[in-house]
Amino acid sequence: MKGTVFAVALNHRSQLDAWQEAFSQPPYNAPPKTAVWFIKPRNTVIRHGEPILYPQGEKVLSGATVALIVGKTASRKRSEAAAEYIAGYALANEVSLPEESFYRPAIKAKCRDGFCPLGEMAPLSDVDNLTIITEINGREADHWNTADLQRSAAQLLSALSEFATLNPGDAILLGTPQNRVALRPGDRVRILAKGLPALENPVVAEDEFARNQTFTWPLSATGTLFALGLNYADHASELAFTPPKEPLVFIKAPNTFTEHHQTSVRPNNVEYMHYEAELVVVIGKTARKVSEAEAMEYVAGYTVCNDYAIRDYLENYYRPNLRVKSRDGLTPIGPWIVDKEAVSDPHNLTLRTFVNGELRQEGTTADLIFSIPFLISYLSEFMTLQPGDMIATGTPKGLSDVVPGDEVVLEIKGVGRLVNQIVCEESAN
């Protein structure tokens, strides 16, 4: 699997029924109006026959579903035209720990090593009326039909491509029911559906696997960008949030990356698009269960990113929605990677943002809530960080709106200067 794996939460009617009462109360206050997207990063993806790793002391749930595989580049496509952009479908297992909330990114539940088995692709005549069967150790444990999904495969492709360009090889997991099948070490989980190659994976205790296997994740040219929400206390206060007690980590899709001296599009009819100057840590070698004391040994260097956000699209659940943070070209990054040896103290760097030459934002990495070693240790405790992966460490206070015609310049002392222009939708087309 070479592309990005997108997944959607709350797309099965049984989930909405189960959460209906909760969604009428704080912090949600209303059910979701749009699809609730998240990303399964590359460390999660395994093939037929490879082991699902069972973390000690956790409850692990199987999530049988179907993956739509994108066949050609799709941007802003109507659902009626979606079939032209679909190469085929594959069975998938959206493995997860139990979720007690949809209010924050569920990276610890969703993004562990091996938590996204994907089967072989095949054409399918009717994905919207497909019975999906889960067998555990040769016996049926569950079945459900895609007719009960809230949004069809075509509707999901259309909704996602409205703000994110989909590329050949990308996958969209169509959703899972509320009730999932519990797994145990030693189980063999097999997923079946008429017309698609079966997907079968053993479940192996994580510590046993580590003792008996030498395992190297396949590397790709593009690493995963993990981003931090509210990692500066002054920024949390600026947005009227309490500083988090645990890192709020979300994932940026590759479609959102753009380079130095490139443009970012402000959508028409929005009221608030703001910049976010961030120090980015680049991982230099594979990291798994790394202590804080040794974490900096795994850093290759640093760069700068601008994590633009469209606040109009932020709904009050499962933050942040991809429509806010993963739109095409919304994350300028660069202009280069500075070797870690050239930065004597990454926790004492000044960040500044200028809009049309006017200083709008200024802060220091000394005010990070969660330090770089802590973040590397935290993430590597439950997932494998790979060379080329990146961690955007958050932004300080000082946000303001930007409009077409603005030049936005980010500076981090000792790391780099990143320049970007804002354009309207018409100029981008």
Swiss-Prot record:
SUPFAM superfamilies recorded: FAH
Organism: Salmonella dublin
Catalysed reactions, semicolon-separated: (2E,4Z)-5-hydroxypenta-2,4-diene-1,2,5-tricarboxylate = (3E,5R)-5-carboxy-2-oxohept-3-enedioate; (3E,5R)-5-carboxy-2-oxohept-3-enedioate + H(+) = (4Z)-2-oxohept-4-enedioate + CO2
Family as reported in the entry's similarity comment: Belongs to the FAH family.
Pfam family, one: FAA_hydrolase
InterPro entries according to UniProt: Fumarylacetoacetase-like_C, Fumarylacetoacetase_C_sf, HPA_isomer/decarb_C, HPA_isomer/decarb_N
Cofactor(s) recorded in Swiss-Prot or TrEMBL: Mg(2+)
Pathway noted in the entry: Aromatic compound metabolism; 4-hydroxyphenylacetate degradation; pyruvate and succinate semialdehyde from 4-hydroxyphenylacetate: step 4/7; Aromatic compound metabolism; 4-hydroxyphenylacetate degradation; pyruvate and succinate semialdehyde from 4-hydroxyphenylacetate: step 5/7
GO biological process terms on file: 4-hydroxyphenylacetate catabolic process
The protein, known as: 4-hydroxyphenylacetate degradation bifunctional isomerase/decarboxylase
